[in-house]
Amino acid sequence: MKIIVDMMGGDNAPRAVLEGAAQAVKEYGVTVIGVGDEALVRRTAQENNISLEGMELVNCTQVIDMCDEPARAIRTKKDSSIVVGLNLLKEGKGDAFVSAGSTGALHVGASLIVRTLRGVKRPALATMVPAKQQAYLLLDCGANVECRPEKLAAFAVMGSCYVNRVEGRPSPSVALANNGAEESKGTPMLKEAHQLLKTTPGIRFVGNIEPRDVPNGEVDVVVCDGFTGNVILKLTEGVAKMLLGMLKQMFLANLGGKIAYLLLKGGVKDLKHQMDSEEYGGAPFLGAKQPVIKAHGSSEAKGIKNAIRQAKICVENDLCGTMQSALDELAAAQKTEE
């Protein structure tokens, strides 16, 4: 299996990307096609004693920066690592694409270069979010700011397929993010979406979920528009960072705190592991014809390695094919209702 990796994307590229790719080659047996400034990549590998075994390098001369306007960058920076990598994926030179680069550029590129599945106009950005009981899939978390009920139904179908095929959870539960659990709550659009989700085939819809209940991890998939999802995601990240910081401050405050830390060290380590987003890989653009994974911009080697693992699982389980079948079933059901 060949996974195309953007060597120039992210705050710590190319060093962290190279390290993560090398670990993935060794642990998962994949071939990595690294796209980027080949001279810089080889020099970085040599300076950091990183093996290039199992990697094929494709040279490119441009990089899409975080400050670049996404659509314009995709059109004008034809020799950038993102555009070259996505074109390689489209041409069948690899099985999936992983990048820690610009989210906006990846979203535009996934739509215009890789193209989308039938029934999908723009892919949804989805991510596994750490929670109390178990991590849940949140979508959309930033790519589609405004969504009609029909789009939310498609998100629910794709999210359910992802959690089932990639996370291995049978019959995953799906909830709609809202300001109340009752059917009567929410905007007219959310009320309409609730009714549509109740009759959407192929999903186990359990109703609305309030933001205060989302972190409990009692459902497998939380569906919402990209604006709401981005707020949920960033608030969750902020609260987690604050709580871990407060714990550290408490343990270091005095001798009693330091003794308490020694007694609770194992539990604290487990908590940090559970809350570490890098453990879950990246955020897939669900609805693209082939797997496109967005790793966190600040990813170190572990995050890149796990994003490659995630891409491998998507390919092995034919995620895109499964989603297309489910979307076709949804379209047929909606046509029958008309």
Question: Which residues make up each language-model segment?
Answer:
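Phosphate/nucleotide-donor binding subsite
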Residues: I50-G94
